[in-house]
UniProtKB/Swiss-Prot annotation:
Name the UniProt record assigns to this protein: Non-specific lipid-transfer protein 2
Keywords, sorted A to Z: Lipid-binding, Transport
SMART domains assigned: AAI
The keyword Transport is assigned to this record: yes
GO molecular function: lipid binding
GO biological process, one term: lipid transport
């Protein structure tokens, strides 16, 4: 897996608005799952990955948010 937060761009709308997650977002989130700890450690990405909407989105997609 190549860690690239740009791959998660289909998830930006739901993360920002709390809207339902499109299928493409869940697919990308599953692909990028091994990268989530790295994103959580990145100050410019943490606010998105750790937000309540992002956690709800991950839960809806069946992707557990890791404890890093």
């Amino acid at each position: 897996v190549t860690c690239s937060p740009v791959q998660l761009s289909p998830c930006l709308g739901p993360i920002n608005s709390g809207a339902p997650s499109p299928t493409t977002c869940c697919q990308k989130l599953r692909e990028q799952r091994p990268c989530l700890c790295g994103y959580l450690k990145n100050p410019s990405l943490r606010q998105y990955v750790n937000s309540p909407n992002a956690r709800k989105l991950a839960s809806n997609c069946g992707v557990p948010v890791p404890q890093c």
